[in-house]
Amino acid sequence: MKILVLNGSPKGERSDTLHITRAFLAGMEEAGPNDVTTVHVNERNIAFCTGCFVCKKNGGVCVLEDDMREILEQILASEIVIFSFPLYSYGMPGALKNVIDRMMPLSSWNMVRDEKGKYGHRMQVDVSRLRHIMMICGCGFPNSKHNFEGAVRQFELKFPGSTIVTVPESPMFNIPQAAPFVAPRLAALKKAGAEFAAAGALCPETLADICSPMIPEEIYAQFANGERT
């Protein structure tokens, strides 16, 4: 399986969320070897979309000559694309948002209406190789409610049918002292990856397990605030 991980964390390799993503990928590896490419978006030259829409009229060629051209090729050559990022202002970091916006060349100017009444642009490139799109997002708050909703809804609209994993308390993945609480979650994420590799989806019970807080939110908040009681 050819997998592309777009790491949107400004921390790059030090990303908290990347620990989550790699545990999931380790589980997928149990079902068979995968060809995984990780792109650290913060290290690439990706300008913001200028909204000229030339790409929708010339067959999908962006006028901006930067690293996004290579990333678009990597997306189209992949079977699974994972957007891995920390929650920033209830959305995604700006560099990764540039990537999403710069996917504009994949679709044409022509609009189509789906069975739910939603309009979108018709694809103008072959995306048949791409089987799954996934969002893996961590956040520094101790609960999911009132935090992930904006990012989740944006992803649902942009990539209907995608798999979405949201994990609160994600800074714990980079804290050695939190290992007793983190280890069971990493094991659960690995198990979830194996499930996804086998079924192409995650059951609600699995999602509930991997997306729940690792420790009670009140205790997490105390530690995050520097309190020791």
What is each of the regions a protein language model found here?
Residues 1-111, 175, 183-229:
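N-terminal beta1-alpha1-beta2 submodule of the flavodoxin-like/Rossmannoid cofactor-binding fold
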Residues 9-11, 139-142, 170-173:
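A short, flexible beta-alpha/helix-coil linker loop
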Residues 14, 61, 145, 166-167:
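A generic secondary-structure micro-motif detector
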Residues 94, 144-150, 175-177:
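A short secondary-structure junction signal
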Residues 108-162:
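Short, glycine-/small-residue-rich phosphate/pyrophosphate-handling segment
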Residues 162-170:
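Beta-strand-loop-alpha "switch" segments that mediate conformational coupling across diverse proteins
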